[in-house]
């Protein structure tokens, strides 16, 4: 009788261990982490670039500023960095008030991962007759904020020689 009870206890223990292991496997397999899609992220960065160009040419400092994260840093040549979306909007607003030539931008390359994306761009400003006034290049780092890829760092400079003092 004692032997029979011992066998029952062992059998119940084996069944419980087997069931608990299966439940752990099921829980693990149902936890689906969204996969990062590089092609989708690249498309989003390209669309963000198009939005930036349109806003620049419309003179829309609010849309321009919203292309940046709240803690963004804009790093232009020969000046201190501008930090934060609000300050970046002020810069664009001052440029727009001074009069903006036509802006174009061409994406050269986009790369990155789910944490950070980067874009290499070539840009130009031209007058109403199409004459290039300035051209240059930039590197932008993007991070996800509020469900959108936004510029986190924007570093740009001109291809023209530095102005003489």
Predicted regions and their residues:
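Sec-dependent signal peptide recognition
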Residues: 5-12
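C-terminal motif of bacterial Sec signal peptides marking the signal peptidase cleavage site
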Residues: 17-20
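Short, low-complexity N-terminal intrinsically disordered segments enriched in polar/charged residues
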Residues: 22-66, 70
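Short beta-strand edge/turn micro-motifs at domain boundaries
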Residues: 22-27, 135-162
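Hydrophobic pocket/interface hotspot
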Residues: 52, 64-65, 72, 84, ...
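A mature extracytoplasmic/lumenal domain signature
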Residues: 68, 78, 109-111, 121-123, ...
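A short gly/proline-enriched turn/hairpin at secondary-structure junctions
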Residues: 73-83, 95-98
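Surface-exposed, charged secondary-structure patches
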Residues: 89-129
